């Protein structure tokens, strides 16, 4: 049963293009189904989380990360009586705007296109799902509901300086950018933090970049490791680690739920409008846990994301993205025909740079590497002619 402050499908603010209702599925269920069957969602399978999937099939990708975020977010939504379908849709789609190599690729596009365009993956997701999916005859894109679009644009909170893509959607739909997002969107942001803080640790261990001993000194997960080592002295390190991560995720989920319930009770939040009008997020980590999460994130940044071998990869991968941009921007006839035609008639350097970013953002890790080889490999292959 949905709580009064959840997002009710029958009260949705609708879609940009009017459609008939489905007699069997509500509007948020249709959003989720459209997303899952989209090519943009499938491409997440071949985009980096921390370690490139090209190097090892066992590392998480943007797809597996998004599935884990969705599972955690649905668990929180269920405990709070929120709309699980809307929550799941926002969670599954939240990383679709990432270019190849994820944050590394985003940094590269931001640097190389800076003179003409500001690339931002949180905004790019709206462009990809709103323009670059072509399954429907009556409109471009997936024609998602207002609540899904609002959640994707604002799941990290109100926006003071919106990206031009978000400004365009705001002009069409009035996304109330100065207000808090729905509680469904808020918990996706927290579920994202929970997922990568716990699962990036797992990939770090798998890679050997971080060690079991490193984790024993961290808050939350380290406390659980020490506890389970004493409770299960015969267990292997991998068994202790798996149980400690499970307990960490559960602990963080309950912390978010407790804070949200306390805020709902204290501030008499009865409707989704009350959630949006509140001057701060109704869902969050408690103060103590928030500090501990920052400590875990700092550990991951210092010991995993910027580890020397990963830093070496960052240099190479950023170079791939930057050089692809330079080729396509200065020689647009190298773009696929449909992109080239749009580039040719674009009336500003901003729009031209945006189109090149669009093309690159739709590439997977492996397709970006293949494109780069076609231009920069020293090997001349017969099939290139």
Swiss-Prot record:
GO terms for molecular function: dGTPase activity. Residues 62-197 form the HD domain. Keywords: Hydrolase. The keyword Iron-sulfur does not apply. GO terms for biological process: dGTP catabolic process. It holds the Pfam family HD_assoc. Belongs to the dGTPase family. Type 2 subfamily. This is Deoxyguanosinetriphosphate triphosphohydrolase-like protein. It comes from Neorickettsia sennetsu (strain ATCC VR-367 / Miyayama) (Ehrlichia sennetsu).
